[in-house]
């Protein structure tokens, strides 16, 4: 039912009127592309733009100011082409980062890190006689080989059965006879940290889908990973640059309903006013998109409703006790296991932002921790956030393959859930959604 006051968006010329709902990377990229030849109105329910591009202005006790990212942190020059193009057009400056990961297990006392050479892998002499750990290192190589072998099987190959192509990570590991030690101390920490999911959920990820991501990012070899970078001054720099190109930015303006009318779309915002647009891009999480559609189709229910998200409580703080005790084992990403057989409900990972963003060494480290709320000293907490991340199951991956069925010439969907859930996936989906409703990035 269309109720409320109707209003048209003021045009600056004869340009089309286009709205983008949601200002994460997908919405910002769509808005940037569409702003080339359209008047764009950007709706954002929050008090700030950016979504996971979330930069905090921090002042230390000596009065020094730092910009610390807590959501989107790193990108690389190999697998982020859409985001890099956006940065280039905006004049965004980036800098090289330190990409490494550690695992610390409270149960057996294990601490090690990858990406830092031998001193990280063997931070203490005792690991040289730790049979389980040394066997795990050999299993890593075997895992890389078997994962690449699965990817090399054509999906229509007669040698490939539905069970091998559709198997979960947990099934893949069991069939490959990988040890529980390897699963607990290498595999689930890797997946859980990368996708911000709990370890049990990590084992339910579709193996082939997961391995395609790892291979794409050079993570199915001991070496060969791309060079990772961060935005100088924080990711807020690109957010501000995009915002300057948009005709109208509406913060604190949740969208309550989206109505489709053939060759136009109406939006009812928080003030109950109806506004008509030539086209709309919905760049929210899928469940939010489904909620604001006034007349969702059966297909939209099936597809958008099949994509779960995890909710992660996140803290920006200075409590270094969440990092490994051994300085040689400390890394940029630091995964914590309460016990060797632990399957915590939430991911427990800490990002050393001083290392990742190459902040000045002042004797105080700025850390972002997902999960582990009770582990962090209250007087060290600077800010608290909640982020949501897409989760991947055989069902959600199947639904993802149908997303293109939902788009039309006047309404398209965007979000990192169209891909692997990362900033490049969001940017690429924003570009494609903008093009679907008539935008051109030239």
Regions found by a protein language model. Name each.
Residues 1-18, 36-37, 58, 393, ...:
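Extreme N-terminal leader/targeting segments of oxidoreductases
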Residues 35-59:
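Glycine-rich FAD pyrophosphate-binding loop
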Residues 56-83:
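N-terminal glycine-rich dinucleotide-binding loop that anchors FAD/FMN and/or NAD(P) in oxidoreductases
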Residues 212-270, 275:
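Helical element adjacent to the flavin cofactor pocket in flavoenzyme catalytic cores
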Residues 77-204, 211:
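Mobile amphipathic helical/loop "lid" adjacent to a hydrophobic cofactor/ligand pocket
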Residues 16-42:
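N-terminal Rossmann-like FAD-binding beta1-loop-alpha1 element of flavoenzymes
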